[in-house]
């Protein structure tokens, strides 16, 4: 029996029971792990094709050879089947499907309108607040840049409501002309509302109208001899002109569209997505879907579109660079999802063709960079394996480091590096929990490794897969401590290397410990540079995590350190001033004015911060 006959037999047995209906089918292996999710207009007809075909492509034959079980879900129509398929693929990540990796929600710029003093912030997730949402932006950096521009031109507040309500004097943003000081009534409500309305117009792509309004306001102020006010409008016009000249060109005059171009080479694909909203280019993002080398660009694009838009708002127009077989079905499905007509165009001429050509050029360049980096990383892995005589190949390395100051806010950190670079979704930080371990580097390392591998053993495949190599920041002592943990979990064959700095802590003078031996490399050795890079990234992540924990602890504990300040008074002070730092900056009279804080307690608080 051919190996693919196994899956064919499973399908043959199920076929008589399957209704002639649209739906989704799932192929599972002997451990009930989903191998593949597919959709069909007519389930029996689609599944019969697997049985009838004699010469399957390698990927399909391999899938059928591992198929022990078939599951079916019927749907009301083909559009529902398409949506369910995309949802199941994203949820289960079957190994024989095209997979969109690193898909995340995009940031929006949010301008609140729940009160008279609107605030501008960056927003991710559900749009459950009352106000105006602008986006999506391709990255947090693009969204932050837009917020900075709104601050610079329109001087809208970015502080949270608690800080805003309890401000007694303006913050530094007022001093550098990034806020108009509404918290201390330096601007009246009517003028502030005008600024907010103009900011909304600006992000909506109506900057010419704003320029006219600002010019008019400047002239009116000049006529009234209010030159200080006129200078404010003059500065805003100047800032607006600078920003307009630096904004990306939208040659095709796209109002609400995504431009999506795929480029395939050497069995790998990059898909570039450019976001156009309100006639503005709001950046682009590169994706590298996982797929078999023999899958066509059309297949990859179709699968990408459904997975990409499964949890995102869809623009009215999607411009792509390759024909897809199920274009009409995808249009219909996305239109139903949005309750609005969605159009997918393959741009072949005119300005839209120029835009898609630019996106395709970006996709090609991104893919070439990715292939180069992947090949380079593989070479670096091979260099490490050769230097330390590691028999099995390297694809994944975990690096560990600790950070603390005199045993306080102790944190352990783990970072991961794979063939495609640093794997951020596998980064972990460990708050040290065991009393007495906080100041003991060896005990901290043992606790971190114990927690990491204990969970891996308990949860099996549901937690992080085991690495091919562990790298420890430390010397012989750390190596011995880590080895004890690995032996305890039966991981005797998991390679581990410790990297210790020299006596003068100079980079390039590192000593490596492995299996009871010590090694030193030439200062110009690429393997040394690579392992330094891994060590430094783990150190950076540990330090960052420690600082965040320390900052949180400082904010939390400042008021807790004052005798006589219980939870009720603490809450009253924080509600009034917004933060412990604001209490520190307050005068004695300001502290005394807080409800529930009598003169004696106010004096104690003031003296605590100023003695």
UniProtKB/Swiss-Prot annotation:
PROSITE patterns the record matches: GIY_YIG, UVR, UVRC
One cellular component (GO) term of this entry: excinuclease repair complex
Subcellular location: Cytoplasm
SMART domains from the UniProt entry: GIYc (SM00465)
Quaternary state and interactors: Interacts with UvrB in an incision complex.
Family recorded in the similarity comment: Belongs to the UvrC family.
Protein name (database record): UvrABC system protein C
Gene expressing this chain: uvrC
